[in-house]
């Protein structure tokens, strides 16, 4: 049977994507982000240059800017993804490279542990120097407890943004999903603020990021609840109850779920007053525990690592489940397959009718002889020679 181009493409196995997801996460864990020449940093510089040309205090101009940035990166990624389909080694390599480029688990955990060490030494100046690499808050306004809370909240939110969400979109859409998601998330980090400059211009980027993270944030909360007994011995049910109660109270439709899950799992209370670029925001409390301490940062990192492993396994299983469905579909004969087989048989019979008629005549004659033997039982008393004659 000859398959159409679209059908052949849909039947390509996706196990190279699964292999690439595993290899990319392993690469990030082993070598982390490069100090120079990181692809995301290069995109950030290009987006900043484009913003300087496109900026206007307008939602429409901001939406055009966000769309142009996403398309400029996602279109080549889609072409590369299409080119490597049907070439498993190359597809696995390109997916692994993309996963390594867009995930940031190692950097997140490393910076959080640096802040934890500084706070445990009571070196507030060193902790304030680390904080800008984790969040956009003004470190000068924070004391030790405020910085501990800021780091725990950053670990919770970025576990979703920098780990779970890229893996989710990589499992769903391969290289284009990975690259497009990181583009949207980077734009949100650059212009998605409620400041006077970006309130209108950054609106589209912020909404795109909300949509892209809606499912991953809830997956992160569920995985945090599942991993909580391993790290903090907290009941998953109690974590989910806090997420259900407090997650929607956060200004962000996604970050609140992740922060509420970490707060419940760690037994701390998150939320409060934050200062972003001179703008003060007061957020509701998440969780029922005490105020975070430096030691809670270390526990948050352990929990984030457990969620990273779980999210990788879940993404790989989701991709392989698609391959299993493809295998079952290819084994099961479809209506098209049956119709094609019948058409082939009919064409063969039409092309060479004489042997078929002879074969049918021979079968009819044999059937007639057998019926005659059954209707004339005198052969039972005849000689062996007569019996042979009847069969002939």
Stretches found by the model and what they are:
Residues 334-343, 356-366:
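Short alpha-helix boundary/capping segments
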